[in-house]
Amino acid sequence: MANPKAKMSKSRRDKRRAQFNARTKAATTVVCPNCGEPTLPHRACRHCGHYRGRAVVTKSANS
C-alpha cells in the first residue's frame, strides 16, 4: 500500500481543498443599496462604484 513520502502541511492541504470548494459552490451575491444591482459582498459595486454608502470608484459616462 502506498504511503506518503513527506507530511503534507496544513497550508498545502487547505489549498487543495479550496480548489474543490471554489468550483462546487455558487458565488454569493448581495443587492447594492445604491443602484439595486447584484454585487459581490465586501466589494465595490461594479455598476455604480459605491461601497458602504460612499463612491469609491469613479465611473465614466460611456462605461
Curated annotation (Swiss-Prot):
InterPro entries recorded: Ribosomal_bL32 (IPR002677), Ribosomal_bL32_bact (IPR044957), Ribosomal_zn-bd (IPR011332)
Sequence segments annotated as region (Disordered): 1-22
Domain of life the protein comes from: Bacteria
Organism of derivation: Chlorobium limicola (strain DSM 245 / NBRC 103803 / 6330)
Record protein name field: Large ribosomal subunit protein bL32
Keywords linked to the UniProt accession: Ribonucleoprotein, Ribosomal protein
The keyword Ribonucleoprotein belongs to this UniProt entry's keyword annotation: yes
Gene: rpmF
One BP term from GO: translation
Biased composition annotated in UniProt, kind: Basic residues: 7-18
SUPFAM superfamilies in the cross-refs: Zn-binding ribosomal proteins (SSF57829)
One of the record's GO cellular component terms: large ribosomal subunit
MF GO annotations: structural constituent of ribosome
Protein family (similarity comment): Belongs to the bacterial ribosomal protein bL32 family.
